[in-house]
């Protein structure tokens, strides 16, 4: 159907937009012989909250309480899919925080679409300076370092808050981060807008399907 085609088209556009932002990040921070950096750690640019699971009896699928994500099972291309809610939220993330899978496989990423409660399979990475896009693409660039925490063979991989805080990074000048954010943030906003349109289109498609099936 044309609705499905539009959904596919938006998804393709979002993939392309993300690749553009990643290429810009690589150009500005990874491939340039940039001497204007200081050696630091992830804790220099972000505040990390480790998830904690509420009691199982507080879960519901009826939209009561806070949106709740247990782990990476709900992850989408950029934003997780709402499934569960909890009336006893413990640890929260806010819109724009990076959501990181902290249990095997460690390193899968999404972004919080809205305020949400995070379970023990996730950590939330919040920019200290309002540079949410810079933090997101920094985390993408750290995937290979995070992969080290995936256990070999039967060992169950995980990463804790101390290890996350201590991940070494090069911290660029704030002016350079601002330059990146000025281009990348509008790209990320466009990804969000396309995602929202796809959510609306999927809702329309799902409401039309039964009618079409029954003729």
Where do the language-model regions lie?
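Short, flexible segments with low predicted structural confidence
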Residues: 64, 89, 106-107, 151, ...
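A short beta-sheet element
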Residues: 70, 87-144, 149-155, 159-164
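Non-catalytic DNA-recognition/assembly elements of restriction-modification systems
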Residues: 1-53, 74, 170, 174-215
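A short, aromatic/hydrophobic, helix- or strand-capping loop or linear motif
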Residues: 56-58, 150-151, 195-196
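Short, intrinsically disordered/low-complexity patches at protein termini
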Residues: 19-20, 32, 79, 92-93, ...
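Sequence-specific dsDNA recognition surfaces
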Residues: 40-59, 64-95, 113, 118-119
């Amino acid at each position: 159907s044309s609705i499905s085609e539009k959904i596919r088209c938006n998804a393709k556009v979002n993939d392309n937009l993300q690749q553009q932002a990643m290429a810009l990040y690589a150009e500005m921070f990874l491939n340039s012989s940039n001497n204007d950096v200081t050696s630091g750690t992830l804790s220099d640019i972000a505040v990390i909250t480790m998830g904690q699971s509420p009691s199982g009896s507080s879960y519901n699928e009826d939209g009561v309480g806070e949106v709740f994500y247990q782990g990476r099972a709900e992850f989408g291309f950029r934003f997780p899919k709402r499934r569960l809610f909890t009336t006893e939220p413990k640890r929260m993330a806010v819109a724009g925080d990076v959501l990181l899978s902290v249990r095997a496989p460690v390193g899968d990423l999404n972004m919080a679409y809205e305020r949400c409660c995070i379970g023990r399979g996730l950590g939330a990475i919040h920019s200290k300076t309002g540079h949410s896009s810079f933090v997101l693409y920094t985390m993408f660039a750290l995937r290979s370092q995070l992969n080290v925490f995936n256990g070999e063979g039967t060992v169950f991989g995980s990463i804790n808050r101390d290890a996350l805080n201590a991940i070494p990074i090069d911290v660029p000048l704030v002016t350079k981060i601002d330059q990146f954010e000025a281009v990348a943030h509008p790209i990320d906003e466009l990804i969000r807008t396309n995602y929202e349109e796809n959510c609306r289109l999927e809702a329309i498609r799902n409401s039309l399907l039964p009618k079409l099936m029954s003729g």
